[in-house]
UniProtKB/Swiss-Prot annotation:
This is Ribosome-inactivating protein TAP-29. It catalyses: Endohydrolysis of the N-glycosidic bond at one specific adenosine on the 28S rRNA. It is an enzyme of class 3 (hydrolase). The keyword rRNA-binding does not apply. One of its GO terms (molecular function) is rRNA N-glycosylase activity. Capable of inhibiting HIV-1 infection and replication. It inactivates eukaryotic 60S ribosomal subunits. It comes from the Eukaryota. Belongs to the ribosome-inactivating protein family. Type 1 RIP subfamily. Its EC number is 3.2.2.22. Keywords: Hydrolase, Plant defense, Protein synthesis inhibitor, Toxin. GO terms for biological process: defense response; negative regulation of translation.
Length: 45
């Protein structure tokens, strides 16, 4: 019973974690990718 309850909790946490990642990814890409591209472009030039 304990192992089953733990597996159920982890599966729910995984779904919740993935949903949060999907929500955060677009924002992180806009915040981090653009500055990285600008810095890398200016550094290469």
């Amino acid at each position: 019973d304990v192992s089953f309850r733990l597996s159920g909790a982890t599966s729910k946490k995984k779904v919740y974690f993935i949903s949060n990642l999907r929500k955060a990814l677009p924002n992180e890409k806009k915040l981090y990718d653009i500055p990285l591209v600008r810095s890398s472009x200016s550094g290469s030039k």
